[in-house]
A protein has these predicted regions:
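Interfacial segments of alpha-helical transmembrane regions
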Residues: 1-5, 67-78, 125-133
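Membrane-helix boundary connector in multi-pass membrane proteins
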Residues: 91-96, 113-126
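N-terminal signal-anchor transmembrane alpha helix
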Residues: 1-17
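Membrane-interface helix termini and inter-helical loops of multi-pass transporters
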Residues: 20-34, 65, 149
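Helix-adjacent hinge/juxtasegments
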Residues: 50-88
C-alpha cells in the first residue's frame, strides 16, 4: 500500500516543525486541563496517517471508474493535507497560537469537504477519515484553549 507509506512520510514531515516547538517555548505555555501527554501524539498521528493513506488508496483505485469525482476528492485531500502541515509550521514552527487557530479552522472545513468528496467515490474511504476529523476537532479545541490561556 504505497498510498499509506506516502501519507505517512509526508505527514511525518510536519514533525520537523513540531520538534522545533516542543522545547522551552511549548513547555512554558499554560496547558489546557484536557491536554494529553506529549507521547500520545506520535502514535495517534501514525494511526491517523495510516487511515488517511488507506482512504486515499480506496479513492485512487476508482480513478478510472469515476475520474471526475475521484480527481476532485484527491485534490481536496491534497489541499487539506497542505493545511495539516501548515498548522504544525504555524503553531510550533512560528509559535503563533492565534494564527494556528485560523489554520486549523480551515483544515477542519477541508477535512469535512474531503469526507464528502471521498463519500461520492467510496463510502469506506469517507468512513476512514472520521477519526481524523474527530482528532482535529479535539486539536482545534486544544488550540483554542492554548490561545485563551496564553
Amino acid at each position: 500500500m504505497l498510498a499509506v507509506l506516502l501519507v505517512e512520510i509526508v505527514g511525518a514531515s510536519g514533525a520537523v516543525f513540531t520538534a522545533q516547538g516542543l522545547g522551552a517555548w511549548y513547555a512554558s505555555l499554560e496547558r489546557p486541563a484536557v491536554a494529553p501527554p506529549n507521547w500520545v501524539f506520535g502514535p495517534v498521528w501514525t494511526a491517523l496517517f495510516a487511515s488517511m493513506g488507506g482512504a486515499v488508496w480506496l479513492v485512487w483505485r476508482r480513478i478510472e471508474a469515476a475520474p471526475g469525482p475521484a480527481r476532485l476528492a484527491l485534490g481536496v485531500f491534497a489541499a487539506q493535507f497542505v493545511f495539516n502541515l501548515a498548522w504544525s509550521a504555524v503553531f510550533f514552527g512560528m509559535r503563533e497560537i492565534g494564527a494556528g487557530l485560523a489554520v486549523i479552522g480551515v483544515l477542519w472545513a477541508l477535512i469535512v469537504a474531503t469526507i464528502w468528496a471521498f463519500d461520492r467515490v467510496d463510502r469506506r474511504a469517507a468512513i476512514l477519515l472520521v477519526p481524523y476529523l474527530l482528532w482535529v476537532t479535539f486539536a482545534a479545541y486544544l488550540n483554542y484553549q492554548f490561545w485563551v490561556l496564553n
